[in-house]
Amino acid sequence: ESTSSESLHFTYENKIRLNTSFKGTDNLLTVFESGNALDSPLMLDLQSKKGDNLKISTLLYKFQLNDEYEAIIGPKMFGYHGLAGKSTAYNERIAILDGSNYTTSSGIGPGIGISKRKKNGLNASFKIASDSSQIDNESIHFINQIGLTKKNFGGTITTNLNNDFDAYGIATFIKPKNFP
């Protein structure tokens, strides 16, 4: 009889992304996901926790209000959707640990937000999101972010305020020239 508590886990994720634009400056995003990490003890959101059946995990519409501002609205989105800041030079989802009790965690629920986005300059975002299928006093998250994005460096300050926890995060990155 083995008393070892070690184990090997293999997880996978299937993802289908559909992007549609009506005006060229907007984006209707639908993402279908499935995977086998539903009961994984790893507790990471990097693999799908949607179960074996293909389901819609993201459904949102992002559009420009004018030259400086954009808005986002949708019935299913992660906390990082619609935030204008750039926390890393690489994969934003991994860098901000979305899906745990961190700065952009709100689960997969409805949300609405507004952002001032600049590819080279100051950014700001305000978003109201939910970790449930509806927005109410128990499930509401207020996610705010300010950031600076330049060609070789940047960062963000992000807050997530709700009834269960308040999270505050600071992220910076430097990407030297001639570095992948």
Describe every region a protein language model picked out.
Residues E1-A71, D98-I128, N144-T149, F173-K177:
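Beta-barrel outer-membrane channel/assembly domains of diderm bacteria
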Residues E6-F10, T104-I108, D131-I140, L161-A167:
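Solvent-exposed loop/turn segments connecting transmembrane beta-strands
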Residues L18, Y69, H81, A89-Y90:
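Disordered, low-complexity tails and leader-like regions
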Residues F32-S34, L65, P75-G79, S87-T88:
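A mature extracytoplasmic/lumenal domain signature
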Residues E33-G35, K76-F78, T103, K127-D131, ...:
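Outer-membrane beta-barrel pore domains and translocons
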Residues N36-L42, G79-L83, S132-D136, L161-F165:
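Gram-negative outer-membrane beta-barrel proteins
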Residues K86-L97:
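Short, flexible helix-coil linker/hinge segments at the edges of structured domains or between repeats
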Residues N120-G121, N137-S139, N144-P180:
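Detector for outer-membrane/organellar transmembrane beta-barrel domains
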